[in-house]
Swiss-Prot record:
The protein's name: E3 ubiquitin-protein ligase RNF144B
UniProt: Zn(2+) 1 binding residues: C30, C33, C53, C56
Gene3D superfamilies: 1.20.120.1750, Zinc/RING finger domain, C3HC4 (zinc finger)
Induction context: Transcriptionally by TP53 or TP63. By LPS.
EC id: 2.3.2.31
Span list, region TRIAD supradomain: 26-244
Binding site for Zn(2+) 3: C153, C156, H161, C166
Cross-referenced InterPro entries: E3_UB_ligase_RBR (IPR031127), IBR_dom (IPR002867), TRIAD_supradom (IPR044066), Znf_RING (IPR001841), Znf_RING/FYVE/PHD (IPR013083), Znf_RING_CS (IPR017907)
UniProt modification remark: Auto-ubiquitinated.
Protein species of origin: Homo sapiens
Amino acid sequence: MGSAGRLHYLAMTAENPTPGDLAPAPLITCKLCLCEQSLDKMTTLQECQCIFCTACLKQYMQLAIREGCGSPITCPDMVCLNHGTLQEAEIACLVPVDQFQLYQRLKFEREVHLDPYRTWCPVADCQTVCPVASSDPGQPVLVECPSCHLKFCSCCKDAWHAEVSCRDSQPIVLPTEHRALFGTDAEAPIKQCPVCRVYIERNEGCAQMMCKNCKHTFCWYCLQNLDNDIFLRHYDKGPCRNKLGHSRASVMWNRTQVVGILVGLGIIALVTSPLLLLASPCIICCVCKSCRGKKKKHDPSTT
């Protein structure tokens, strides 16, 4: 073969690489959706180096922002050894601008709530962060809002009461333009949670309320505790009768579902109890055998 033929052969082999050189890039399994994705569709977290597909991570972040109330967004891997936390720069790159602004606002509100030297003005329309003077733990101090000049207690958020305890204090004194929104009136649109005293606004809907701050469930009209009222019997009698805000049919359907769940759990317990009784001797024997083996292993007289 001449030199021209050898050059043509080398050019052909260079332009047509072997099949091994065209092997596809390795796929990585996402721990959230369990789908295999290429590396360009994955995102690695900076703090813990865990890797997930970008689409799943975006959905996870948006859900964490809506449900997390400003708490840090942790790695979605439940068995992450480094317990990684997502940085703000990562969140800003993966969620829309409005979602990131919501996260920053909720985060700031949470920081103020946990800071003993800052608190929110209890007037709903004010939303001013007020400085709290240092004091002994649990000792109430006078706080004055720099915007609306409301003077209130740092502990119970009621009007400042210098000579009485928080439980015996009078209702909070609000500016005239806000008094129609607050108070003990059953139809008032804004009330305080009976447990944590956070202000809650109700526009419409169900009268069974759950405080987002402390998870306490109560009746909006009389503020009675409903944590253990799974059948909603509170709205069958008394001053709150038929004030739940749902039709009678929906209430009966809810009670039917609760009864069905309880009956199902009872049936499962009845079915599994004989099996547990039959298997209990075997379980006890295995436990005793294991204990004897450990005792012999650590007994110095046997060595």
